[in-house]
Amino acid sequence: MTAPPADLDAALTGLARVPTLLVALDFDGVLAPIVADPSTSRPLPGSAAAIRALAELPGTTVVLVSGRALGDLRAVAGFGAPVRLVGSHGGEFDDGPLVLTDEQRAAKEALERAARGVVDGEPGVRLEDKPAGVVVHVRGADPAVAERVLDAARTGPARLPGVAATEGKAVLEMAVVQVSKGLAIDTLRGRLGADAVLFAGDDVTDETAFARLGPGDVGIKVGDGDTAAAHRVGTLEDVTQVLEELLAARRR
């Protein structure tokens, strides 16, 4: 698209006028394409440039809010300060490590054992370890294998005491702390005293963030699928255009 739709353009214009603005963005499928090897994913150059410029503006905080582990997100995103990072669907903030209680550590060990029993020997499936839990990835698996593994994870480790499950596109994350992108948005808004929030996401896990937006905020769904977001764009290039429009409006 050459410019955001009229309703989104008007929303961005209003958003640009607030004194304290939080710009929160998912990474994969929003800033960077989803690829077979997640370690090779990088943000589109235009989006990266707009993010860096926005983050330098007074009263403007840009935060990447991703399902990736914080260290993984830092490695692929390529941003330093003042751009902020939140990983593990809000389970890891870049201002300090996540500390588990003894009970949570024991629950995580039990979760890891149960999850390993589900994925071991399954072709195209991998288990990712995170500070507060594990993630079952099935993007590389045959559809029948993927569904079998996800069903086993849903009915097994995901139901262990103290475990909260979050399902996304070809992934099932299980954690021993309650996390969501919606809670992360609430936390960031409170810490920053933000007058308004822009959030853009593409996955079902982003819907908790869209649900936390209120009057004056702007939610943008990237791609297809049901959503609570008020606005939608089709491609990552459209996201670049949105960020550039917001940057230009906030500089005025």
Spans of features found by a protein language model:
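Mg2+-dependent phosphoryl-transfer enzymes with acidic/Ser/Thr/Gly-rich catalytic loops
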Residues: M1-P5, V18, G182-R252
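A short secondary-structure junction motif
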Residues: V135-A146
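Short amphipathic alpha-helices in soluble, non-transmembrane regions
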Residues: L111-A115, R148-P157
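Histidine/lysine/aspartate-rich catalytic loop segments that bind and position anionic ligands
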Residues: G133, D151-L172
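Active-site phosphate-binding/coordination module
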Residues: R42-K130
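Non-catalytic pre-domain segments flanking phosphatase-related domains
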Residues: M1-F27, L31-V35, G46, R189-G190, ...
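Substrate-recognition "cap/lid" segment bordering the active-site pocket of phosphatases
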Residues: V86-R113, T166-A194
